[in-house]
Amino acid sequence: MTKIYIDGDACPVKDEVFKVAGRYGLAVTVVGNAWLRLPQDPMITMIVVPEGPDAADDRIAELIEPGDICITNDIPLGSRCLIKRALVLRPNGKPMTENSIGDALATRDLMNTLREIGTMTGGPPPFAKADRSRFLSALDTMVHQAKRVVP
């Protein structure tokens, strides 16, 4: 059965995930390096990992299986999940796919380089109400896709 994993430390759509998962009876695991207040629901669990770079990502990549869904903005984690035949959705509602992940990794590396040399100093645009709406719709669609991967 499909499970949803949330890269939880800075995820702005946890409540939306809980809502959609509840509608479909899906288990949700939030992974982060600090305890978060979560709804009291037997289908929602929290895994706290030690602090450190990529500790949460490593745990999600270890647990995720084909047909599961990962909610993350982390492109390398998204790539690792796609390799395991999981589905990946960004909090802004844009999916990461096998077709888009290569470009996303290259763009990420380019942006890191530009920031390092001081050419670019900004980050991503702020999270907007339209992103939340797009996310809800995309997650609903992705749940149906996941059911086709793992009946």
From Swiss-Prot:
Among NCBIfam families, the record links this protein to:
PRK00124.1
Question: Which superkingdom, per the lineage?
Answer: Bacteria
Q: Which Pfam families match?
A: DUF188
Which family does the entry's similarity section mention?
A: Belongs to the UPF0178 family.
Query: This chain belongs to which protein, by name?
Result: UPF0178 protein amb2838
Show the InterPro entries listed in the entry.
UPF0178
